């Protein structure tokens, strides 16, 4: 975008955001319901925008702590997808980075905090990508569901 008065060029680069597939020892995924717009009431993964000076890994830890009260001990990068996040009348272009955070600990006491209305566990066969709020998350969910290496066989 070029300023017609001074000629300054502003490049519209995407804002980095993170989301986590939190997987318990039964290979269930933690799913959240959005408490606020955009897409209030729709399904989501815990996550959010990175802050200035923060790595994406630090953002994952911070967002999980804020939204579900849990800090992962390990995480693995899975994939990324571009997205358009409509907020306050503006289209915010994002690059959403997805991580897998597995845990063998008891996670039955996780509760929704911050901008999460509720959180609950779903087994692989219960997950429906089309019920998630954003296209990038639907694509990441679909990719995870199709890759058997992430799922424990019964």
Q: What function would you assign to each model-found segment?
A:
Residues 79-108:
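Active-site-adjacent beta-strand/loop module that shapes the phosphate/pyrophosphate-binding cleft
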Residues 12-14, 42, 89-95, 111-116:
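A generic structural micro-feature
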């Amino acid at each position: 975008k070029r300023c017609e008065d001074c000629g300054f060029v502003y490049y519209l680069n995407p804002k980095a955001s993170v989301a986590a597939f939190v997987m318990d020892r039964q290979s269930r995924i933690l799913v959240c319901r959005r408490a606020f717009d955009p897409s209030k009431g729709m399904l989501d993964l815990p996550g959010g925008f990175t802050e200035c000076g923060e790595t994406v890994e630090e953002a994952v830890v911070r967002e999980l702590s804020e939204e579900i009260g849990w800090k992962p001990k390990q995480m693995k990068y899975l994939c990324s997808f571009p997205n358009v996040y409509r907020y306050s009348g503006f289209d915010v272009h994002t690059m959403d980075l997805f991580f897998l955070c597995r845990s063998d600990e008891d996670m039955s006491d996780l509760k929704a905090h911050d901008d999460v209305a509720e959180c609950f566990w779903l087994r692989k066969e219960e997950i429906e990508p089309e019920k998630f709020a954003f296209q990038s998350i639907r694509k990441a969910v679909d990719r995870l569901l199709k890759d058997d290496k992430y799922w424990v066989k019964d």
